[in-house]
Amino acid sequence: MRLVTPGRLLALGAVLLAVAFALYVIPSNEYIFLPDKAHPVAPLVTVQGGHDPVHGGVYFVDVVVRKATILEKLFGGLHKGADLYPASAVNPPGVNDQQLRRIDLQDMSHSQQVAAAVALRAAGKHVVLRSIGAQIDEVAPGLPAVGKLEPDDVIVAINGKRVQSKNDVFTAMSSHKIGDTVSFTVRRGKQTFVERMRTVSSGGKSPHAIVGVVVETAVDIHLPLHVSIDAGGVGGPSAGLAFAIQVLAELEPDVLHGHKIAATGEIEPNGAVEPIGGVKQKTIGALIDEIAPGFPAVGKL
């Protein structure tokens, strides 16, 4: 029988500590969604001729998304309000984390432009705001669109049917089976051309036909006054509704009625609010700061 000496106990403790540390820092193959705090919007938005509301305020709520550590994957209850998702539910097919970050920042910039235009229109200002197609944000490596389509190209038709928004692309692609050949009419600068591509599988639990592009709605926007929005390093389009409400509140003082509200949701050029993701995390983030969540299931500004 071997004696358990202090030295052996110390060595065993060091090994267990090293294992625990490794489990805590080594990323797994899944992503974790965590609540984030509510962010005041007023310091981020400046409207020419506008004024911040004296009472109340608008806040946007975000979701912290990162690779889950092995420990977080094994014990999902380590963080309040956390959810785990496979990579296929977070990254578009063929898109890596660096590309996804770039897409998120582009989506944020786009959402700011649309939010300003929608809000000014709601305030009765003359605004030019038109959806003119689906702009390509990213082309995924190794998929059919490589060498044929490029970032900033605008898809204006699919199989001859006009495309005015990203949702038109999703609808058109959903009607095709994996392996179908699809015709894309594309505008690149002043040139318009047609590319035909055979679709491939997206993979994952719900495989569908793709060609390997990430798109957003292309818009033509002209505003009658200057609006500046600076979200720092926050990405994604879901702060659009909060930005729009803030712009409107700076021009129309009675919008908030003195309340503090947390708003989230991607806003479309027609004023519609897209379905909201991460509702659980965003609700927790708002309630932690004692701010009333104002998340429309379906809405329009």
What are these regions (language model features)?
Residues 1-14, 102-106:
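Membrane-entry signal-anchor segments at the cytosolic-membrane interface
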Residues 8-27:
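Hydrophobic membrane-insertion alpha-helices, especially the h-region
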Residues 32-53, 59-65, 87-140, 196-254, ...:
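PDZ/PDZ-like peptide-tail recognition elements
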Residues 46-49, 166-173, 183, 195-199, ...:
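Short beta-alpha junctions and helix-cap segments that line functional grooves
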Residues 120, 145, 152-155, 184, ...:
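Terminal peptide-recognition signature
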Residues 145-168, 282-283, 290-301:
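Conserved PDZ fold ligand-binding element
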Residues 170-214:
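PDZ-domain C-terminal substructure recognizer with occasional recognition of PDZ-binding tails
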Residues 241, 245, 249-255, 261, ...:
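Glycine- and Gly-Pro-enriched alpha-helical subdomains that act as flexible
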